């Protein structure tokens, strides 16, 4: 039996149909249900399920807890990513140097990244304890009567969460930057050295411009991962003190599974998803997002050339 050319055109679609159906069921269907739920007041415990239209969206802007979560999420993402870039590039440069034990160091440096965030959060909760934590125990070796509750005070609790997030994911960021450094030919540095360039000049004129695309591209997924951080906060501070370390992902989970306020949680999820989508679209927009930032390295190199 022969198959006509017209029938052959449908074979690829038939083959990918199961994937499309599975993808639609696991992605599209939950999104549509979440959109629908965001228009309802759904409280599981009281059995309430009433259509309220956009009331949930209006209430978001009046909710002090949500505003606190949004403000800390912004602080968390910005501060964490700034240090990811600065310290990540610095660590990558160190790992790119030639020294004995380099391969071993490149391996063990990934141990924090390989550990579950919940384990890190629980260890940090113990480590920052005032009475028996490692942090205060170390400080008391120099200041005998030192007493400080790191996770009870807002500023230090937020700083501790950011520090542990860096401790976990910074090595992975550095290894990915290192992969970009590996593609830079050593002949370029040799030529620069012959021309009289020192280490600082080589970094700004050669290294930084050549790894800029790699670094900026890495910032996209790492920023998205910061925006969806939940497990670290859950294990380390449970959003405390008060709501001061409650990231938006933690707030959504709390509303859905602790308060059982499904409609309000769906509203927060829709708004968070919209912000993520807008950020992604802006990041890939020509001349405004990542494409524009790709020229930053060239600009830095040019400015450094002028200054010298």
Give the ranges of each region predicted by the language model.
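A structural signal for multi-pass alpha-helical bundles of membrane permease subunits
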Residues: 3-282, 308
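Short linear motifs in low-complexity or flexible loops
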Residues: 283-288, 292, 301, 307
């Amino acid at each position: 039996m022969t198959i006509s050319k017209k029938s052959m055109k449908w074979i690829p679609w038939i083959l990918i149909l199961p994937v499309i159906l599975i993808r639609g069921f696991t992605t599209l269907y939950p999104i549509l249900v979440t959109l629908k739920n965001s228009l309802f007041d759904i409280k599981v415990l009281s059995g309430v399920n009433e259509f309220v239209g956009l009331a949930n969206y209006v209430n978001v802007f009046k909710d002090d807890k949500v505003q606190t979560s949004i403000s800390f999420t912004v602080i968390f993402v910005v501060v964490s990513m700034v240090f990811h870039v600065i310290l990540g590039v610095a660590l990558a440069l160190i790992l790119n140097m030639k020294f004995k034990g380099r391969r071993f160091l490149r391996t063990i440096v990934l141990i924090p990244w390989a550990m579950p965030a919940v384990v890190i959060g629980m260890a940090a909760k113990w480590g920052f304890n005032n009475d028996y934590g490692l942090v205060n125990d170390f400080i008391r070796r120099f200041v005998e009567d030192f007493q400080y509750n790191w996770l009870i005070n807002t500023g230090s609790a937020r700083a501790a969460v950011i520090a542990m997030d860096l401790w976990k994911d910074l090595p992975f960021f550095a290894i990915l930057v290192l992969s970009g450094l590996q593609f830079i030919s050593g002949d370029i540095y040799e030529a620069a050295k012959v021309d009289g360039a020192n280490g600082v000049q080589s970094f700004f004129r050669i290294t930084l411009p050549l790894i800029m695309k790699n670094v900026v591209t890495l910032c996209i997924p790492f920023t998205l991962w910061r925006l969806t951080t939940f497990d670290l906060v859950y294990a380390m501070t449970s959003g405390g003190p008060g709501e001061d370390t409650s990231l938006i992902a933690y707030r959504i989970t709390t509303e859905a599974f602790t308060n059982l306020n499904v409609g309000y949680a769906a509203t927060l999820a829709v708004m968070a998803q919209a912000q993520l989508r807008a950020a992604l679209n802006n990041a890939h927009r020509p001349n405004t997002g990542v494409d524009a930032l790709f020229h930053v390295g060239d600009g830095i190199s040019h400015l450094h050339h002028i200054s010298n």
